[in-house]
Amino acid sequence: MTHPGVYLSLRICWPISVDQPAAAAHLTENLNVAFELYQVRTGDGLKPLARNGLAAEGTREAVGIEIRQTIDLCRSEKGRVMRNNAQHLKLQFAKAWEDDGMARQEIRKFLHTYTSTLL
């Protein structure tokens, strides 16, 4: 379990502030590679979320129930699907950094644009 920073391998997101709620939403709603905890929210975070209407109770009991349910989901078919999705993303990232991959091509263009003038 971790905050959903973009450089971490995630499974269960506990978003706190700044970019973390958006990252958690992307990982859970768009990529389907992580679970997000809602009951850990406090303050304004207890309001219903615009994207799915879920509102947190924010109690210790609700947090405990949600964590146990999330662990069960990690072990379920839904968890298996998420692991498969994460594996697929891993392969896409690896392919992007191969010699002819998109990421490699883009970094070469960037370096050519901004370093060729320095030589």
Residue positions per predicted region:
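Catalytic core of nucleotide-sugar-dependent glycosyltransferases
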Residues: 1-119
